[in-house]
From Swiss-Prot:
<feature type="disulfide bond">
    <location>
        <begin position="366"/>
        <end position="379"/>
    </location>
</feature>
<feature type="binding site">
    <location>
        <position position="606"/>
    </location>
    <ligand>
        <name>Fe(3+) 2</name>
    </ligand>
</feature>
<dbReference type="GO" id="GO:0005769">
    <property type="term" value="C:early endosome"/>
</dbReference>
<feature type="disulfide bond">
    <location>
        <begin position="29"/>
        <end position="64"/>
    </location>
</feature>
<feature type="disulfide bond">
    <location>
        <begin position="39"/>
        <end position="55"/>
    </location>
</feature>
<comment type="subunit">
    <text>Monomer.</text>
</comment>
<keyword id="KW-0406">Ion transport</keyword>
<keyword id="KW-0964">Secreted</keyword>
<keyword id="KW-1015">Disulfide bond</keyword>
<dbReference type="GO" id="GO:0005886">
    <property type="term" value="C:plasma membrane"/>
</dbReference>
<keyword id="KW-0732">Signal</keyword>
<feature type="binding site">
    <location>
        <position position="211"/>
    </location>
    <ligand>
        <name>Fe(3+) 1</name>
    </ligand>
</feature>
<dbReference type="InterPro" id="IPR001156">
    <property type="entry name" value="Transferrin-like_dom"/>
</dbReference>
<keyword id="KW-0813">Transport</keyword>
<keyword id="KW-0408">Iron</keyword>
<feature type="disulfide bond">
    <location>
        <begin position="356"/>
        <end position="388"/>
    </location>
</feature>
<feature type="signal peptide">
    <location>
        <begin position="1"/>
        <end position="19"/>
    </location>
</feature>
Length: 702
């Protein structure tokens, strides 16, 4: 072979290798021959120039999870119960898209779990014991988790927990006979119709599997009740069937909104967290939905194959979404209860609050508090306010003090306010009462150096300093006002360079940020909404103004707390409060002492937040701790809750005079006030302002 031919051959092989490397694929896991047939149809009809679809067949969902985890497959669409199971070890899968059952303009990513019975039967919900039951599958949402959880909650089903017997054994004693595909207890497989090894398998190889299968079990007179979704019963059969309501009434199939077991999250597409394939899967499915020949949501070989037939589209989930946030705290905790048993109320024994800290300095202060509190306070670690919110949602922490902007997010994620900070040292009367209607407030202000030419009316192109994206005084108020006045959602293009911790580190909103000057190697922490960014928070925004910016957005006390010798840090020790002024919304300026007349807004105080069922416990303990370590506490010489060493505003704002208990049942919106709540809601319509956690918590409302 001559040299030129060898070179040509090598180049051809190299080109082939590069082509193979560039070819992207999505390997879909299917669980039956009927799903495999549909998948092969999709391979032929859902062509994509850059991404190839292929099919991987396994016997059941668990095998698919293993295949995805071991990189033999990439994706599967499952119900909420399996979203939860797939997120656990050893699978570590995450949801990336949700089925939409509404329309392309009005999405609905939830469905209803219902109990379907024949009209000819006469029993009520409370008379389910000793009836024959048809279920979609073990661990599935509508067919198992919701109904079994409800039976336990209503104390119709007796189960002392896994230490006494398995949940399956307890359920097998409750129903006369059942078909629960995937169950191990023989009596729960008694009604199933699969042949040989396929009997009671958790796949379409079992005729009574899934929604259509559970309904067929009822149709075939094998069962007395089928636990399915609201759209399972075909319209032509509505005249013969009705819904069993938890209040012991019955209603027509069409009245599912008033007669259901629960409204639950949609089915979701799962993939690996490791070597993330999300982008390819989402891109393929989005393109597939645009192709008329590609029938993702029809099942010519059965029912609900690969996706539910009632789905109209697939919607990408926010990047911050995990299985817990997708399912919601109530449903996630309900599934956990099915594993551990319903615990007796132990609120009397709960004598501690786990406080979430957001920096090393906060953790140090919290550890000191723990030591002297006699175990009433424990500490958890996080690096941002949003991480603390998630910890509380997941039950890993109990409380944290938040700024109004983060409180807005926390409220939409399901947390409630417990204790509000109070700042007015000229009127301490509310602090001396056991109950008070007073509310703490502070002022959002725009701070500038005296002698500069900046005014509120000429902020275009100005270098700005913010406490963090999503915080009240440093972002929501000033950016909301500017956005409202200019009609421009693109705040980054309006101002010059900024430091707005929490922004995209590559954007000009992070251009002024410096990270932690003492840890230069941690460049990844630059612009982090945490103490890892030197320009984070009130004092951080003021430092940014001093060193780099032209205007700083903070609270009315920020200048006083960092000047005239109040802050010994090198950047602040020589600063004089008289060298700074406030920008007024009317275009004028005022001394920093005139904050009540020259401010951007009066805003709600920071507050302690927790889960609704922890509210009384947290309030009781914090009130007690304040009586000991507050400004007038009996043991304030040992520890002071509202004083910070090694930092500013640690755990609570240093300007806090006391914490006022917020009346029980007060919602987050009521505490923040309609005006502020509406302002933040409007600001969040600008996509650049909406945090990942907020997007996840508001994705759907089941």
């Amino acid at each position: 072979m001559d040299l030129s031919l060898r070179v040509a051959l090598c180049l051809s092989m190299l080109a082939l290798c590069l082509a193979i490397q560039k070819e992207k694929q999505v390997r879909w896991c299917v669980k039956s021959n009927s799903e495999l047939k549909k998948c092969k149809d999709l391979v032929d009809t859902c062509k994509n120039k850059e991404i190839k679809l292929s099919c991987v067949e396994k016997s059941n969902t668990d095998e698919c999870f293993t295949a995805i985890q071991e990189d033999h497959a990439d994706a599967i669409c499952v119900d909420g119960g399996d979203v939860y199971k797939g997120s656990l070890q050893p699978y570590n899968l995450k949801p990336i898209m949700a089925e939409n059952y509404g329309s392309h303009t009005e999405t609905d990513t939830c469905y209803y779990a219902v109990a379907v019975v024949k009209k000819s039967s006469k029993f009520t919900f409370d008379e389910l014991k000793d009836k024959k039951s048809c279920h979609t599958g073990i661990g599935k949402t509508a067919g198992w988790n919701i109904i079994i959880g409800l039976l336990l909650e209503k104390k119709l089903l007796k189960w002392a927990g896994p230490d006494s017997e398995t949940l399956e054994k307890a359920v097998s004693k409750f129903f006369k006979a059942s078909c629960v595909p995937g169950a191990k207890e023989p009596k729960l497989c008694q009604l199933c119709a699969g042949i040989k090894e396929h009997k009671c398998s958790r796949s379409n190889n079992e005729p009574y599997y899934n929604y259509a299968g559970a309904f067929k079990c009822l149709q075939d007179d094998q069962g007395d009740v089928a636990f399915v979704k609201q759209s399972t019963v075909p319209e032509e059969f509505h005249k013969d069937y009705e819904l069993l309501c938890p209040d012991n009434t019955r209603k027509s199939i069409k009245e599912y909104k008033n007669c259901n077991l629960a409204k639950v999250p949609a089915h979701a597409v799962l993939t690996r967290v490791r070597d993330d394939k999300s982008k390819d899967i989402i891109e393929f499915l989005q393109e597939a939905q645009k192709t008329q020949e590609c029938k993702l949501f029809s099942s010519p070989y059965g029912k609900d194959l690969i996706f539910k037939d009632s789905a109209v589209s697939l919607i990408p989930l926010p990047s911050s979404m995990d299985s817990f946030l997708f399912l919601g705290a109530d449903y996630s905790n309900a599934i956990q209860a099915l594993k551990e048993g319903v615990k007796e109320d132990d609120s009397a024994a709960q004598v501690k609050v786990r406080w979430c800290t957001q920096s090393k300095a906060e953790k140090t202060k919290c550890d000191d508090w723990t030591t002297i509190s006699g175990g009433a306070i424990e500490c958890t670690e996080a690096s941002t306010a949003e991480e603390c919110i998630v910890q509380i949602l997941k039950g890993d922490a109990d409380a944290v003090t938040l700024d109004g902007g983060y409180m807005y997010t926390a409220g939409l994620c399901g947390l409630v306010p417990v204790m509000g900070e109070y700042y007015d040292q000229d009127d301490l009367t509310p602090c001396q009462r056991s109950s008070s209607q007073a509310k703490g407030v502070y002022y959002a202000v725009a701070i500038v150096k005296k002698g500069t030419q900046v005014s509120w009316s000429n902020l275009r192109g100005v270098k700005t300093c913010h406490t963090a994206v999503g915080r009240t005084a440093g972002w929501n108020i000033p950016v909301g006002l500017i956005t409202s006045e200019t009609g421009n959602c693109d705040f980054a293009s309006y101002v010059g360079e900024s430091c707005a911790p929490g922004s995209d580190v590559k954007s000009n909103l992070c251009a002024l940020c410096i990270g932690d000057p003492e840890k230069l190697s941690e460049s990844a922490k630059k612009c982090s909404p945490s103490a890892s960014e030197a320009y984070y928070g009130y004092s951080g925004a003021f430092r940014c103004l001093v060193e780099k910016g032209q205007v700083g957005f903070a609270k009315h006390t920020t200048v006083f707390e960092n000047t005239d010798g109040k802050n010994p840090a090198g950047w602040a020790k020589d600063l004089k409060s008289e060298d700074f002024e406030l920008l007024c919304p009317d275009g004028s300026r005022a001394p920093v002492t005139d904050y009540k007349k020259c401010n951007l807004a009066e805003v709600p105080a920071h507050a302690v937040v927790t889960l609704p069922d922890k509210r009384e416990q947290v309030a009781k303990i914090v009130v007690n701790q304040q009586s000991l370590y507050g400004r007038k506490g009996f043991q304030k010489d040992i520890f002071q809750m509202f004083q910070s060493t090694g930092g500013k505003d640690l755990l609570f704002k240093d300007s806090t005079q006391c914490l006022l208990e917020i009346p029980s049942k007060t919602t987050m919106q009521e505490f923040l006030g309609d005006k502020y709540h509406t302002a933040v809601t409007s600001l969040n319509k600008c996509s650049t302002s909406k945090s990942g956690l907020l997007a996840a918590c508001t994705f759907h409302s089941c």
